[in-house]
């Protein structure tokens, strides 16, 4: 959930999954 790298953030996404695992989920 970071502007630098959407794939890597370490923060919990809205769905509760890590940003690193929700690479495609963000788009």
From Swiss-Prot:
<dbReference type="GO" id="GO:0007168">
    <property type="term" value="P:receptor guanylyl cyclase signaling pathway"/>
</dbReference>
<dbReference type="GO" id="GO:0006182">
    <property type="term" value="P:cGMP biosynthetic process"/>
</dbReference>
<dbReference type="GO" id="GO:0005576">
    <property type="term" value="C:extracellular region"/>
</dbReference>
<dbReference type="GO" id="GO:0097746">
    <property type="term" value="P:blood vessel diameter maintenance"/>
</dbReference>
<comment type="function">
    <text>Hormone playing a key role in cardiovascular homeostasis through regulation of natriuresis, diuresis, and vasodilation. Has a cGMP-stimulating activity.</text>
</comment>
<dbReference type="InterPro" id="IPR002408">
    <property type="entry name" value="Natriuretic_peptide_brain"/>
</dbReference>
<dbReference type="InterPro" id="IPR030480">
    <property type="entry name" value="Natr_peptide_CS"/>
</dbReference>
<dbReference type="GO" id="GO:0005179">
    <property type="term" value="F:hormone activity"/>
</dbReference>
<keyword id="KW-0372">Hormone</keyword>
<keyword id="KW-0838">Vasoactive</keyword>
<comment type="similarity">
    <text>Belongs to the natriuretic peptide family.</text>
</comment>
<keyword id="KW-1015">Disulfide bond</keyword>
<dbReference type="Pfam" id="PF00212">
    <property type="entry name" value="ANP"/>
</dbReference>
<protein>
    <recommendedName>
        <fullName>Natriuretic peptides A</fullName>
    </recommendedName>
</protein>
<feature type="disulfide bond">
    <location>
        <begin position="7"/>
        <end position="23"/>
    </location>
</feature>
<dbReference type="InterPro" id="IPR000663">
    <property type="entry name" value="Natr_peptide"/>
</dbReference>
<keyword id="KW-0964">Secreted</keyword>
